[in-house]
């Protein structure tokens, strides 16, 4: 028996819709007789724009409403930016597919007056816009002379704030800029020795109801094996550290032949402490590599850094 209809839950932001439309089009190409519909909605993270993401403090800021649609039987799948999807999913839901990763780098975007600068040459006191604690902590560590200011809203809104002079530059995900047609605004891809990217950054995660084999069979055409293995290691690293989307944890992964290399980082919010290391192993042991690296960093003080952050958030 085949599946006749597939309902996709999605955030309604411009980037989310670009990503979801891509998933729909790819699935439609492989399954031309399948009726595919999209239900777009706003999530808590989309609605609360006057508070820094870290202060809202909910791991499912951009996913809970989509997950509710699936659990209520109103959608078969949900499309997420994988970096927004918590590592522990609600009972009854699974991560059914991870798509091929786009460039996971962080990107520097500047306004007209700062075109002559790279990140490393920005003048003292330059205002850097970011909503990510991970980017904030790493950049404070390397460039303590810069001023960091929270920025919220969709990509277009953020670019408008930059161009109006509210910020000297922004740090955004390169993949999001490319998907929205703003690749020309990427002034510099930030090197990984300065900023490790977020877990899952650049990849899409498709969540679905567990036990729905027909849905999983349909999603197989979008699964990208090497991206999936890399993200499995990254997500197990994050899970073992008990971190969410709004913690200063960064990663980098690569696969050479059958060897998976995972680099991980935990930093304090003031930028004064940064713990970083690399773990290598067989691709077949991706999850174990992530767990082992997390425990190594814990042994070097990462646990204490994260506990301070969690305690501050609870206060």
Swiss-Prot record:
Pfam families: Porphobil_deam, Porphobil_deamC. Its cofactor is dipyrromethane. The keyword Methyltransferase does not apply. SUPFAM superfamilies: Periplasmic binding protein-like II (SSF53850), Porphobilinogen deaminase (hydroxymethylbilane synthase), C-terminal domain (SSF54782). One of its GO terms (molecular function) is hydroxymethylbilane synthase activity. Signal peptide: none annotated. The keyword Transferase applies. Gene3D superfamilies: Periplasmic binding protein-like II (3.40.190.10), Porphobilinogen deaminase, C-terminal domain (3.30.160.40). Belongs to the HMBS family. One of its GO terms (biological process) is chlorophyll biosynthetic process. It catalyses: 4 porphobilinogen + H2O = hydroxymethylbilane + 4 NH4(+). Binds 1 dipyrromethane group covalently. GO terms for cellular component: cytoplasm. Tetrapolymerization of the monopyrrole PBG into the hydroxymethylbilane pre-uroporphyrinogen in several discrete steps. The modification S-(dipyrrolylmethanemethyl)cysteine is found at residue 245. Keywords: Chlorophyll biosynthesis, Porphyrin biosynthesis, Transferase. Monomer. This is Porphobilinogen deaminase. CDD domains: PBP2_HuPBGD_like. It comes from Prochlorococcus marinus (strain NATL2A). It comes from the Bacteria. The porphobilinogen subunits are added to the dipyrromethane group. Its EC number is 2.5.1.61. Pathway: Porphyrin-containing compound metabolism; protoporphyrin-IX biosynthesis; coproporphyrinogen-III from 5-aminolevulinate: step 2/4; Porphyrin-containing compound metabolism; chlorophyll biosynthesis.
């Amino acid at each position: 028996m085949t599946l006749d209809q597939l309902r996709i839950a999605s955030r309604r932001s411009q980037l989310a819709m670009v990503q979801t439309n891509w998933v729909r089009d790819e699935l439609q190409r492989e399954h031309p007789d399948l009726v595919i519909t999209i239900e777009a909605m706003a999530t808590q993270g989309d609605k609360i724009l006057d508070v820094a993401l870290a202060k809202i403090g909910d791991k499912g800021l951009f996913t809970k409403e989509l997950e509710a649609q699936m659990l209520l039987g109103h959608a078969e799948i949900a499309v997420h930016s994988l970096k927004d999807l918590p590592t522990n999913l609600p009972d009854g839901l699974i991560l059914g597919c991870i798509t091929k990763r786009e460039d996971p780098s962080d990107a520097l975007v500047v306004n007209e007056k700062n075109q002559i600068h790279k990140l490393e040459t920005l003048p003292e006191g330059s205002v850097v816009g970011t909503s990510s604690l991970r980017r904030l902590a790493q950049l404070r560590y390397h460039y303590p002379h810069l001023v960091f200011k929270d920025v919220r809203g969709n990509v277009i809104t953020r670019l408008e704030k930059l161009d109006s002079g509210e910020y000297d530059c922004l740090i955004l995900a390169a993949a999001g800029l490319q998907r929205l047609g703003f690749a020309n605004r990427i002034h510099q891809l930030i090197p990984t020795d300065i900023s490790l990217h977020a877990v899952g950054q650049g990849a899409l995660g498709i969540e679905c109801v567990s036990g729905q084999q027909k849905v999983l069979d349909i999603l197989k055409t979008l699964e990208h094996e090497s991206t999936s293995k890399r993200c499995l290691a990254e997500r197990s690293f994050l899970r073992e550290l008990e971190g969410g989307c709004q913690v200063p944890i960064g990663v980098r992964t690569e696969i050479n032949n059958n060897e998976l290399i995972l680099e991980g980082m935990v930093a304090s919010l003031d930028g004064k402490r940064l713990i970083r290391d690399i773990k290598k192993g067989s691709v077949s042991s991706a999850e174990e590599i992530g767990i082992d690296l997390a425990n190594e960093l814990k042994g070097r003080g990462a646990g204490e850094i994260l506990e301070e952050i969690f305690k501050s958030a609870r206060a």
